[in-house]
Amino acid sequence: MLTGVTDGIFCCLLGAPPNAVGPLESVESSDGYTFVEVKPGRVLRVKHAGPAPAPTPPPPLSDAAQGDQSGLVRCQRRITVYRNGRLLVENLGRAPRADLLHGQNGSGEPPAALEVELADPAGSDGRSVPGSAGSGSGGRRRRARRPKRTIHIDCEKRITSCKGAQADVVLFFIHGVGGSLAIWKEQLDFFVRLGYEVVAPDLAGHGASSAPQVAAAYTFYALAEDMRAIFKRYAKKRNVLIGHSYGVSFCTFLAHEYPDLVHKVIMINGGGPTALEPSLCSVFNMPTCVLHCLSPCLAWSFLKAGFARQGAKEKQLLKEGNAFNVSSFVLRAMMSGQYWPEGDEVYHAELTVPVLLVHGMHDKFVPVEEDQRMAEILLLAFLKLIDEGSHMVMLECPETVNTLLHEFLLWEPEPSPKALPEPLPAPPEEKK
């Protein structure tokens, strides 16, 4: 932090632009954390852990040399946006849906076409209607509509199993509003033991990261640029993004910005595929001093809404996990800064990365219908419901969450019939 302030003073004296982003500077602490300066005066605490570096193995043969077609998926989709505010998503290829998890909730082949009414900024929820776009209510034929724009997606992706011993795999964990990287403790310990490299930052104003006293420091775009800087610093060839609540939006942003580097995404209680817009009538619009006085009530409300039970164990988890521990100023700025009009249904429908959706059925912040709608919009999505979990499901049910995440990391789609190797010819019979 002191280094950032000093650099800012020198920038002013030398006439350099104060917001110019230079090379990331970092300081290692004795307790295993790294403090990364993403911008002058803006320092994030990062937990970066992994196995000891192993001897470099010989480089593997290329896929063309091996003739390997495993994990190869053809992503074909047409997205049409109409002027009347409706969205038509047509899946033109075969998506690997039902071969992920045994006992998966809501598994099955995606509909050939999905018609969605885009959610308006006022907050009315869109309704998705699987089926043909030409069908109308009451047998009445609709008038031909002029499309506003059409997006064609046609690409091939290789989706492979991500194992802990592989040096090109990195897991990124991003928390939500009011939390810190401590909410991922069980997941970080679990995956480090399995040999994975993990990266978990504290958002600005959260945990041990710096907390600028300017509301503009907590807009979605400011926080997204922080996550971009962390991602570019630690990313390798195959990166997996795991987000919770508001953190899911940053995972979506990075997956959209870096489709070749993001291998898989896991969204935990992230909500529906709608653009972000702060609510005008919210308790978080009250003055900071009022929010400070209400902080005990807000913490109790979070305990009731974020946990399936409100016993001594949950209270301890809330305290130790820093699930809701943030200043009133940062909380108000975070809630009012959730403005991201680009992150609408079209933005999510363009993603071609496989996504695992995890939802705690007792969640009072995010209705299950929102995650179900997200699963409908995404091209490669798998929804898993945890009956005994709530919004903080990674704290309540760590073993279940760890198992689901690990299974998804190891999953790879079955090869298409065209990619299956031809059987070897039978050896000729010997003549007697």
Swiss-Prot record:
EC class: hydrolase
Active site per database record: S245, D363, H391
Chain intervals with Pro residues compositional bias: 52-61
GO term, biological process aspect, one: lipid homeostasis
Protein family membership: Belongs to the AB hydrolase superfamily.
Annotated InterPro entries: AB_hydrolase_1, AB_hydrolase_fold, Epox_hydrolase-like
Protein name: Protein ABHD8
Keyword presence, Hydrolase: yes
Known partners and oligomeric status: Interacts with NLRP3 (via NACHT and LLR domains); this interaction is enhanced in the presence of NLRP3 inflammasome inducers, such as ATP, nigericin, silica, or alum. Interacts with ZDHHC12.
